Structures are given as C-alpha cells and as structure tokens.
UniProtKB/Swiss-Prot annotation:
ATP binds at K546. Belongs to the class-I aminoacyl-tRNA synthetase family. ValS type 1 subfamily. ValRS has two distinct active sites: one for aminoacylation and one for editing. The misactivated threonine is translocated from the active site to the editing site. This is Valine--tRNA ligase. It comes from the Bacteria. It is found in: Cytoplasm. Transmembrane segments: none annotated. Disulfide bonds: none annotated. The gene is valS. A motif ('KMSKS' region) lies at residues 543-547. It catalyses: tRNA(Val) + L-valine + ATP = L-valyl-tRNA(Val) + AMP + diphosphate. It comes from Granulibacter bethesdensis (strain ATCC BAA-1260 / CGDNIH1).
Length: 896
C-alpha cells in the first residue's frame, strides 16, 4: 500500500490512471500462465488496423471484453486475452503512399516493391503502436507480452501453410469471375470495403431492334456504357408481353451484334419495362444469368475504368451499327463514354426516354469512386464447402450466438455463400505462395525453394504479384496467434477460445471465416460463444458520422472524465440486441457515480473504517449490519449471473443500485448515529461491516471501473499495491434466519422513509418543515418497528412524531400504503391544499395533452414509415415518459 494522509476531495483520474496501469503491466497482472492448474479462459481481441485510432466502436468492444476478462481473472481463471493488430492491406498501403507524396518522394511504382515494403515496415515501427497505446488508456488488460501482428513471421508461416493445404485439397483455385474492382486503387476489394451511396441519376430507356425487323424491345438501364458488352436481353418466362419473343434475337445498337432474348426469372415484370439487358462481365446478377445460359462474357472496361474493345466485335456500318463511333470509344474514361453513347443513341433514334432516377451506387470506401464489377482472373476459396461445418456447429450448439437472433443472420449468409475472392492487387500483405513457370504452369508451395523443386526445371520461377485479402490472415487469428503450426503447446491449452465479442457488421467477414478455418484446420470450433453487440450511436439514436458532426472521440472523454465513467456508461447501456445511445451526458452521469463512490469512501475513512483482519460476517448482531450483508449477497449474486449471461447492462445496473441506493443512501445514512458514538461495540461492528462491504463494492465494480476501485483498494490497505485486479471475486455468504429477519425489517424502514419522502416531494412540502406520521390499521409488529426506529424515521423522513391512528383521518391528509398499514401525513396548514390540487391537475392535464399528440403521431402509419428510426424511437420514449408523469401526478392527486 502506498502512503496517503487522507483521501483527497475528488478522484484525480489524470494523476492515477497511467500510474496504475503501469503498475499492473509491470507486475505481470495481465499475463496468462500456461503452467497454472487453473482453468483457462481465452478471448481473442478483434485485431484493430495498425493504421487505426481508437473510436467509439473500439471503446465499446474492448470495454465489454475487458470487463469480462477482469471478472474471470478475479474468479481465478487463467486468462489469456490475446492482443494484436491487423496489417490492414489497403489502408496501410494508402497511408504510406500519401506519406511519400507529402514528403515529395518518388511514388510506390517509382521506387519499386522491395523499397516500398521497407518504407511500410519503417512506418509501422514508428507509428503503428498508436492504437495499442490508446487501448492502454482505456484500461484494457491485454497480455501484451503475447502481442501479435498479422504479418509476424509466425503468422505468415501459418498463412502459407493454410493456403498450400487448401490448394492441395482443391479448396483454393484460380478462376475468371466478377469481383468488386476499385479503378482508382486498381485492386479487387471485399464487400466490406464497398459502401452504398444514394445517387440521383438517370434511367435510360433504349430500343433494341428485333433481328427480324418486326419491331423492337425496350430495356431500361442506369449504365448505358456497358451495353457494348451486352450478351442477351432477359425477360421473365411468364411475362405474356414477351413470350413470343423468347428465343428470338435483337440487334445491339452501335455494335450491330446479334444477341438472344432469353427467359430468366431474374427479370422482374413489375420493374421498368420487364426486359433487362444482360452484361455478364460488368454486373454480378448478369454474371449469374450468363452462366445459367452459357452466354459470352466480353469485358469492355480495363482496370483503370477505361473502355477497351479487345473482346468485342462490330458489324459493318448500318442504320443500327456505327463501328467508327465504337472504335473512337477506345481508352475513354467510363463516364465520358457514357455521355458519348447516350448522345449517339439519341442521334440514331434508339433512345426512347430518359427518366430521373435515384438509386444506390456501390463506391470504394477508401477511394470514394464508384466500384466496377470486373471480370478478372483471381484466386478464390471454395467458401461454400468450408461453410458447411460452420453452419452445422451453430445448429448443434457447439458455437452459440448471443443474442440468439444473430444465428439467423449467420445462416442466411453462409447458406448462400459465393466463392471468396482472396487475391488483392496490392504490395502490402501476405504475398500469394504461388510461382509460375515460363509455360504458365503454377506451383503452390510454402517457399520458393519448394516450388522450384516441384517444378524441376532450370528456369527460375516467378512468384505471383498479388497478396492475400486481409481477412484471410484474420480468419486464422484464433490459432495462428497461439503458435500454430510451429508449436502446439499453447494452442492445446487455450484453444478453442471461450467467447468472441464483436459487432454484427463483421459476422460474415470475420466471424464466419474464423469458424470455417478453425473447423477445417483445427477440427474444432474457434470459440464457444459469440456475443454480438450493436452500434454506438449518439444520444438521439443517430449513426455517428463526420458529416453530421456527431462523432464522439473516446480519448476526449477519457481526458475529460477518466476511463472509468466512459466504461461504466458503456456497460450500463450495453443491452443485448440493441444499439447504444451514448452522449457526453451519459458519461457525465457515470462520472457522478464515481464521485458518489469516492465520497462514500471519504466518509468511511473519516469515521475510522478500515479492513479488519479475521472479520467474520457471521458474527454480526445489529439488524443494520445483517441487512447490508444480505443486500451485498444479493448484489454479488445478481452481478455474477448478469456477467455469466453477457448482460453487461444488468451487471452495471446492479452495481449502481447497490452502491448508490443501498450502500450510500441508506446504509451510510442509517449508520451515522451509530458511528457518532465512537467507542461503543455497535460502532466497532458497523466499522468492520462497512469495511467488509466497501471491499465487496470495490471488487464488484472493478471489471467496469478498474482505476478508481484499484486506487481505493490500495489506499484502504485491502491488499498489496495494484492487487485488486487479482483479488478474488466476492462470494455469497451463508444465509440465516436472523439475517432474513433483519432484511425484512430494514427493507420496511427504507420503504416507509421513501414513501414519506415521495409524498412530501409531490406535495411541495418545504424541506425544513417537520410533519407528523400517523400509522392507520397497523399491526402490533409494525407499531413496534416504528418505535424501534423512531429516531431514524424522524431524522430521515423529517417527521415530528410517529404514532398510531385510531378513528377518522385528519382533514387535509395525504396517504400512502405500506403493507397492511396506511401512512397518513396531515398537511392542513402546512401547504395550500386547494392550490396544490389545482397545480397537480394542471400538470396532469398538460401531460395528457402532450401524450395525445405523440399518440396521434405514432398512430400515423405514414409518419412511422417515413421518419428516421431514431425519430420514431424518440417519440416512443417521449410517450413512455409522459405516461409515467401522468401516473405519478394521478397518484399524487389520489393521496389528497
């Protein structure tokens, strides 16, 4: 214990947090112990990007994880919370490319691959630790000695091993398929790196003449430039308008190519004209149609998003075909080509109408440009085959989703999963372990030497230029970080992991793929539970975005209030299956809770409360002592059950109620008169009980509020410095009849004082005014209780007397029910009863009027359908608050 004269007036988070964290870290408090006989508890950090900075999503995920691991550590489990960062292929490459540009240095392609990668590694060494420093500020008790990076040599070896294994099993292969192509970054990107943006554009209706000259068919498209690569027109097989045309052909304007009219259910008769142009090489749905009908798939765009004509043909010039115009499109940027094509179609009479049209266009989330579905040769993984055991594991209960509803999302994605494009046209990342011979043959091996040996020729093989999708290495995270494939000793102890805590947005991209790889490579699920949390929104329920100006910086909150209030606010709001509405006010409220705990501790210290070695709670005799011990047991039981069920909100609410209401508001207040008589046995018992319960409080709160609790634990001398983190989780004591009787008696006292305070508050009785309390219809035991606690009732309920009432109620009395008795508080002459009735009636009527307006709004189906979800939710919350006010005001009127 470090020495302090007395606790200061307030907890100074700035002076204590980093000091305490360093004490924990240097003392090995976070470290797992593989040699321990304790049951392991393993949880994997979702590795943040090495380029990242702490945002509220991180704060949510890591607060919940840290609360869980601190609790399990206190339960005596051998906790491994595995830290690390992701190499973040595109993000990191862009950061370093921008850095080179800002320095005026030559670009990536000018300096070459090796020099560029050296520069990335230097940047990582200099700046890549930013996010891990910020996680320390949050209080995350990660086992930093085991920190991993997805491009560490050990993890890279695991990546190569898995790639080679899957390739040899036929589960990784090369294919020419459509991918999301970013023309600016010039790489394939994952669906997670694509964001849909609403764009106000046009829907062009274009006339395609029938080959037999007997009319034409009209198609509608938002992308007329892709018509150069059309292979068919699709109509629904049951659309009577086009039944007679199925099997016939149209002549494609501009190129003059002959393309068929095919029947396919992809075409929606209710949408547009019901006829759809099919461009298999530039649309994912069209690609599927093309494969079903064995259509040609000419690509008309290069990797920079420019028109290329290498794969298409034109007929001679006719009134339909204009080969000279088409030839002139070669090399044009796609949107410039669009304008030219629309203009030429209009000149030739094929543009039927132009309709203003708002639609969603996929954009690269980093480049900001519209992505292009592009037919390219890439490496793919047979995700459908790998998904089958993952689906079965969830169906059987080997892996459990919490909340359970997320299982449906998991199943929906995995039962309709497409081949996973795992190659990226980048330099930063795990280079694909495939080598090519001069004749184009492919040799997949863990090393160049193995590939060369397999080839057997004298020519030097050339390694594939591409790197793997970042999610490929992330999918191996639960076992690659534990030493596989080189050393299985740690893996056998800590795998499978116990729980994964993450957001719903990466169930498919990360959770599902970890399950695929874990089951296929390790033959075990990677985690037993998957806890899915929602998004962090602002206090109005709106999604945070820079454009709205409502982004909350967690580090700014930590600087202003400390990590504890932010962490506690997050836990308090983290209910299952719902988003978190977090604003500065929530953190300020939690900061007041920290202050409440601190003030109670100051009170205890000033009244001589300190840990009593050998104190046995079973020996106490005072009803107040027995009551607070029973209440502490209730809190321990409820907090433990909540954490076991991942109900972080219930855990935090339990702690809040017990500390603020039970311990501070009632125990401390009821203990004050006893503590004034400093040398009595009663005072000694209350001090010992207070010290014991404060120790329980600090341990209960530690998972969510580690800094203030460790500070107080150290200060009071409950254990050596920095020892709360490994102190045992409190256990429920043995119940006995005396403790239960004390619980009933003090609970009765608390309810009586609470009812009187409510009446006085509702009736606007001045705090300085004492009022008598009359007990009508009270049984003998109630009267005896009132007598035993007369002084406390008088002090805390502002009562001039507490007596039984026989006969009629005094005129102008307020009433409240307490068990079998009626509490009567005479108010004649204390307040203006008529004025009070008028005030209460006026406030109730106003609340009713406001509630009626909100009800009308919520009953308006058009409002509910059109308004933003957060606005509808605000109105529902407002209605609930108004209904509570109406009930409260009605009850107050009934009291009169």
């Amino acid at each position: 214990m470090y020495e302090r004269a007395m606790l200061s007036k307030n907890f100074d988070h700035a002076a204590n947090e980093q000091r305490i964290y360093a004490g924990w870290e240097h003392g090995g408090a976070f470290a797992a112990n593989p040699a321990s006989s304790a049951t392991p508890f393993t949880i994997m950090i979702p590795p943040p990007n090495v380029t990242g900075s702490l945002h509220m999503g991180h704060a949510l995920t890591f607060t919940l994880q840290d609360s869980l691991v601190r609790w399990r550590r206190m339960q005596g489990r051998d906790v491994l919370w595995q830290p690390g960062t992701d190499h973040a292929g595109i993000a990191t490459q862009m950061v370093v490319e921008r850095l080179l540009a800002s320095e005026g240095s030559p670009g990536r392609r000018e300096i070459g691959r090796d020099a560029f990668l050296d520069r990335v590694w230097r940047w990582k060494a200099e700046s890549g630790g930013n996010i891990t420093h910020q996680l320390r500020r949050l209080g995350a008790s990660l086992d930093w000695g085991r920190e991993r990076f997805t491009m560490d040599e050990g993890l890279s070896a695991a990546v190569r091993d898995v790639f080679v294994t899957l390739y040899r099993q036929g589960l990784i292969y090369r294919d020419r398929r459509l991918v999301n192509w970013d023309p600016q970054l010039q790489t394939a990107i994952s669906d997670l790196e694509v964001e849909s943006r609403e764009v106000r554009g046009n829907l062009w209706h274009i006339r395609y003449p029938l080959e037999d000259g007997e009319g034409s068919i009209i198609v509608a498209t938002t992308r007329p430039e892709t018509m150069l690569g059309d292979s068919a027109v699709a109509v629904h097989p049951e659309d009577e308008r086009y039944t007679a045309l199925i099997g016939k052909c149209v002549i494609l304007p501009l190129t003059g190519r002959r393309i068929p009219i095919v029947a396919d259910t992809y075409s929606d008769p209710e949408k547009g004209t019901g006829a759809v142009k099919i461009t298999p090489a530039h649309d994912f749905n069209d690609f599927a149609v093309g494969r079903r009908h064995d259509l040609p798939m000419p690509s008309i765009m290069d990797r920079e998003g420019r028109i290329t004509l290498a794969e298409i043909t034109c007929t001679e010039a006719t009134d339909i075909a204009d080969p000279a115009f088409v030839t002139g499109l070669e090399g044009q940027e796609r949107f410039a080509a669009r304008k030219a094509i629309v203009a030429r179609l209009e000149e030739m009479g094929f543009l039927e109408t132009i309709e203003t049209h708002t639609h969603h266009v996929p954009h690269g989330d980093r480049s900001g440009v519209p992505i292009e579905p592009l037919l390219t040769t890439q490496w793919f993984c047979n995700a459908a085959e790998l998904a089958k055991p993952a689906v079965a594991a969830v169906e059987s209960g080997d892996t459990r989703f919490v909340p359970k509803q997320w299982e449906n999302t998991f199943f929906a994605w995995l039962r309709d999963i497409q081949p996973w494009c795992i190659s990226r046209q980048l330099w930063w990342g795990h280079r694909i372990p495939a080598w090519y011979a001069p004749d184009g043959s492919v040799y997949v091996a863990a090393t160049a030497e193995e590939a060369q040996a397999a080839y057997g020729g004298s020519e030097t093989l050339t390694q594939d230029e591409d790197v793997l999708d970042t999610w490929f290495s992330s999918a191996l995270w639960p076992f690659s970080t534990l030493g596989w494939p080189e050393d299985d000793s740690i893996l056998s102890r800590y795998y499978p992991t116990d729980v994964l805590i993450t957001g719903f947005d990466i169930i498919f991209f990360w959770v599902a793929r970890m399950m695929m790889m874990g089951l296929h490579i390790q033959k075990q699920v990677p985690f037993r539970d998957v806890y899915i949390h929602g998004l962090v929104r602002d206090e109005r329920g709106q999604k945070m975005s820079k454009s709205k100006g409502n982004v909350i910086d967690p580090l700014a909150l930590i600087e202003a209030h400390g990590a504890d209030p932010m962490r506690f606010a997050i836990c308090l709001l983290a209910g299952p299956g719902r988003d978190i509405k977090l604003g500065p006010k929530r953190v300020e409220d939690a900061s007041r809770f920290v202050t409440k705990l601190w003030n109670a501790s100051v009170f205890c210290e000033r009244n001589g409360v300190k840990p009593e070695p050998g104190f046995d709670p079973a020996t106490v005799t005072l009803p107040l002592s027995r009551w607070i011990l029973a209440s502490a047991d209730d809190a321990i039981r409820a907090a433990t059950q909540a954490l076991e069920a991942y109900r972080f909100d219930d855990y935090a609410a339990t702690c809040y109620r017990f500390v603020w209401n039970t311990f501070c508001d009632w125990f401390v207040e009821l203990a004050k008169p006893i503590l004034l008589a400093t040398d009595t046995p009663e005072a000694a018992e209350i001090k010992a009980v207070a010290a014991h319960v404060l120790g329980v409080v600090l341990r209960l709160l530690h998972p969510a509020m580690p800094y203030v609790t460790e500070t107080l634990w150290d200060h009071f001398g409950y254990g050596p410095e920095f020892s709360l983190i490994r102190a045992p989780w409190p256990e429920v004591g043995v119940s006995d009849p005396a403790r239960e009787a004390a619980r009933q008696e003090i609970d009765w006292l608390v309810r009586l004082i609470g009812e009187v305070r409510t009446v006085r508050n509702e009736m606007n009785v001045p705090p300085s005014t004492l009022t008598p309390i009359l007990l009508k219809d009270a049984v003998a035991e109630t009267v005896a209780r009132a007598e035993r606690w007369r002084d406390q009732i008088a002090r805390l309920a502002r009562a001039s007397s507490v007596t039984s009432l026989e006969g009629a109620l005094p005129k102008g009395s307020a009433q409240a029910v307490l068990d079998e008795a009626i509490l009567v508080i005479p108010l004649e002459g204390v307040i203006d009863l008529d004025a009070e009735r008028t005030r209460l009636t006026r406030e109730r009527d106003k609340a009713r009027d406001e509630a009626a307006k909100v009800v009308r709004k919520l009953e308006n189906a058009d409002f509910v359908a059109r308004a933003k979800p957060e606005v509808v939710e605000e109105n529902r919350d407002r209605l609930a608050a108004l209904e509570a006010d109406i009930a409260r005001l009605g009850a107050a009127l009934e009291r009169l």
